[in-house]
């Protein structure tokens, strides 16, 4: 607890002093501070982590002056929180990103760590998500040029970050976008044809030692008489493993009068899939297809999305694993819930073979006489199957979610919401019911409470920490005093198998751009998701301090 207190005082001091320094010369300084620290306490029902304290910290500073900008980000893991072990072994403080950029009317160039995305990210996306412990920025150079409003061309080259270190892999790519609507002077529509190329290169000499073991294959006597040694790269290449993997993408974007149509197809060359099979050198080509059709009119909107993936997991380093080991973006195309029980067992993308999609509908009915009264209706359906058929010629179900929610603003003081979700994820089926009510006492004070119930259909004789473990009940009570204070208590109780309470309580204080949150509770093992990408988090009990500030 002493380390937790000292850290809070230090970061609060930095936040206060930094917020006063916004102008430097003719330029502008901006930045942010984020700290997430947990002191793990003993718990008879949950094993306490070996290290009783963890802290993930980030400090980012940017400077801009006219067309010039630059920035850095420092990360400190003191040590890393449980579940983020890939980020650091023990204590680590390092420069995680830096950049210098020049931007003109039609031209820009950036040297440093690149965060970018081609199209929908199926072929390439570099980004940071601290909740997932994810940062695959590209250290190198990126340049872009706009030929008026008609053509945009950009290219990049660099080495990607793999957790706290840079990989020995090299990535290069180019992206082209042509606006046919502007060329045809059709101002009423959006019509773009786009394409991308991405190459990942890793020297075969960087392959792990087990691939260098010629005893794995008696016929692997590839001997170099000049050096008197085995030629390991040639040996590895004899299994079909190549240093280069290429991805090609074609895209179409169309929009007119509330209608949007988007499509993308990606072809991926032969890639090595670590851990997919015991056979050394398992290589496979891949492809992805994505289609979206949406329409909105006044208070009504509908969006239908389809996607198929076949061997599209594209690792930064094909010989390693982990959520952060990826150069492309393959999120789950399912509804992302914020309610506890609805998000108990989220869908995990099967990048090497899935087929499915989702449909999302929204409608809002507003009172013509009272702006404080309205109805919001929302329905969503998503389903995914294995790409390849089974022995009976049918595709096995991976996921299905049918859900509907209704929100009602009754007057200035009362608002309520009801949600129902049916989820089927191969291992079990669940019916989830949620009630959410908010009462505003005045302009500042409000009280919100939730009640949730999960009715499970899984086999109660077999369960583990990653399944629903039978029925669940949950509740939350939150009291807010805007714009500064918020207090909450919540509990999630398993009434089907473990009979365990997962309780949590805390408060937050916000002042200008600084927010401090302190909480204590027991957290269930499971997946934490952000933007459709999930990371496994082990169970723990502890005191959690979060500080965020920007200037």
Predicted regions mapped to residue ranges:
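Well-ordered mid-protein domain cores that form the structural environment of catalytic cofactors
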Residues: 100, 105-122, 126-147
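Phosphate/ribose-recognition catalytic cores of enzymes acting on nucleotide-derived substrates
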Residues: 97
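In a subset of proteins, long, contiguous C-terminal domains/tails are tracked
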Residues: 2-5, 12-13, 509-551
């Amino acid at each position: 607890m002493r380390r937790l207190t000292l850290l809070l005082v230090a970061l609060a001091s930095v936040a206060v002093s930094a917020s006063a320094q916004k102008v430097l010369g003719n330029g502008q300084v901006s930045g942010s501070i984020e700290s997430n620290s947990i002191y793990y306490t003993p718990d008879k029902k949950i094993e306490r982590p070996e290290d009783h304290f963890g802290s993930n910290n980030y400090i980012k500073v940017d400077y801009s002056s006219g067309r010039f900008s630059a920035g850095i980000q420092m990360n400190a893991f003191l040590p890393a929180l449980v579940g983020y072990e890939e980020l650091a072994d023990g204590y680590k403080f390092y420069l995680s990103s830096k950049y210098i950029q020049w931007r003109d009317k039609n031209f820009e160039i950036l040297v440093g760590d690149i965060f970018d995305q081609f199209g929908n990210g199926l072929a390439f996306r570099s980004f940071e998500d601290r909740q997932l412990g994810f940062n695959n920025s590209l250290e190198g150079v990126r340049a872009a040029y706009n030929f008026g409003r008609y053509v945009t061309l950009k290219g990049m080259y660099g080495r990607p970050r793999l957790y706290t270190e840079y990989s020995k892999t090299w990535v290069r790519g180019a992206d082209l976008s042509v606006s046919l609507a502007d060329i045809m002077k059709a101002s009423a529509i959006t019509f773009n044809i786009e394409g991308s190329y991405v190459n990942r290169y890793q020297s075969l000499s960087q392959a792990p030692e087990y691939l260098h073991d010629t005893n794995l294959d008696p016929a692997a006597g590839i001997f170099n008489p000049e050096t008197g040694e085995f030629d390991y790269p040639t040996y590895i290449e004899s299994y079909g493993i190549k240093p280069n993997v290429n991805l090609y993408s074609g895209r179409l974007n169309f929009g007119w009068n509330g209608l949007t149509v988007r499509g993308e197809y990606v072809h991926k060359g032969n890639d090595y899939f670590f851990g997919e099979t015991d056979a050394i050198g398992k290589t496979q080509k891949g492809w992805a297809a994505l289609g979206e059709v949406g329409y909105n009119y006044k208070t009504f909107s509908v969006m239908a999305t389809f996607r198929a993936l076949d061997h599209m997991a594209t690792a930064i380093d094909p010989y390693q694993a982990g959520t952060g080991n990826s150069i492309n973006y393959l999120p789950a195309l399912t509804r992302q819930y914020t309610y506890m029980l609805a998000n108990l067992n989220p869908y995990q993308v099967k990048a090497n073979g899935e087929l499915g999609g989702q449909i999302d509908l929204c409608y809002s009915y507003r009172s013509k006489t009272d702006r404080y009264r309205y109805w919001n209706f929302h329905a969503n359906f998503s389903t995914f199957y294995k790409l390849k058929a089974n022995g009976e010629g049918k595709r096995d179900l991976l996921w299905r979610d049918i859900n509907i929610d209704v929100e009602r603003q009754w007057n200035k003081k009362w608002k309520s919401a009801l949600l129902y979700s049916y989820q089927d994820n191969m291992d079990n089926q669940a019916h989830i019911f949620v009630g959410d009510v908010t009462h505003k006492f005045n302009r500042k004070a409000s009280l919100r409470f939730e009640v949730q119930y999960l009715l499970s259909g899984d086999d109660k004789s077999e369960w583990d920490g990653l399944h629903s473990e039978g029925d669940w009940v949950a509740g939350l009570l939150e009291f807010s005093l805007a714009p500064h204070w918020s207090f909450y208590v919540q509990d999630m109780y398993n009434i089907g198998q473990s009979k365990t309470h997962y309780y949590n309580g805390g408060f937050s204080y916000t002042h200008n751009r600084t927010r401090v949150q302190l909480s204590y509770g027991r957290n269930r093992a499971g997946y934490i998701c952000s933007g459709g990408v999930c990371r496994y988090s082990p169970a723990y009990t502890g005191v959690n301090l979060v500080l965020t500030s920007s200037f």
